[in-house]
Amino acid sequence: MLLDEKLDKLMKTILRLKAYKEEENLRRVIGEFHSIIDYAYEGMYIAEDMLREEESKGKEVSTY
């Protein structure tokens, strides 16, 4: 599922962020924060689409 893929990428990015922070590699830390924001937004939009689909299916069932 697409949402699961985004969550996996987000978790892996968080782990890399922690590693770069420990190394005091601030350029990489900044890059990983950008990636986290991107994955979070993508996941949010995917979840919103899934919710809309769920709600529209619920309306279809209730109209019969």
UniProtKB/Swiss-Prot annotation:
Q: Which species is listed as the source?
A: Bacillus subtilis (strain 168)
Q: Which domain of life is it from?
A: Bacteria
- Protein name in UniProt: SPbeta prophage-derived uncharacterized protein YopV
